Amino acid sequence: MATLFDILNTLNNNNYFENCKRQCSINKSNKTIIDIIPPMDVTMTNDKLIIETELAGISKDHIEIDIKDSILTIQGEKKKNLNKQQQQLVIEKSTTSSTTLDSKEDEASIEEFEDDIKPKSKSTVTTTATKENKEDENKTKLSDKKFISERSFGNFKRYLDLTKVLYQLDLNSINTQFENGLLTITINKKLHYSNTIKININ
């Protein structure tokens, strides 16, 4: 029979790097690319199980939590926030692409193009080159210079095996709280529990 120390030792993931390797191997089998494995603290008190996971910079709308086959899974996506200049570039790109599509729809027929090709070819090339130069200048002005880039973005996932303590927990009492980048999951323990089920003979 496992002691309380054994249970806590398993839950707290003391060997963090080995746990990361195990989770990465599971993710590979599911063909899911995981960019972030968030750190976690697990505490068992006399009346509850407390799971704290650091998810700084992540919106609660991008977090999913579920329990399946005694495995608690916390997953989601940490998206990169765009500043005003980057948002403006995205808008300009979308506007340029839509303008290009409109211009293609309004293209002249072959006959009209052949009649006007000689007098308009030089001015058209010059105008196009000028527009491209202006766009390059605007992009250069709007682009930011990054000196340090250490933050991680992308998909995150963390598993917690509850097999050894699941019989003690009241899953109907699960409570979650997300504040200041810290996700706290609290599960109350049952008032009366046992890891042994007595079977009567009829």
Curated annotation (Swiss-Prot):
It comes from the Eukaryota. It holds the Pfam family HSP20. Keywords: Stress response. Residues 96-138 are annotated as: Disordered. Belongs to the small heat shock protein (HSP20) family. The keyword Amino-acid biosynthesis does not apply. CDD domains: ACD_sHsps-like. Induction: Down-regulated by Pseudomonas aeruginosa, PAO1 strain and PA14 strain infection. This is Small heat shock protein hspG5. InterPro entries: A-crystallin/Hsp20_dom (IPR002068), HSP20-like_chaperone (IPR008978), HspG1-11-like (IPR051779). The gene is hspG5. Coiled coil: none annotated. The keyword Isomerase does not apply. Residues 31-202 form the sHSP domain.
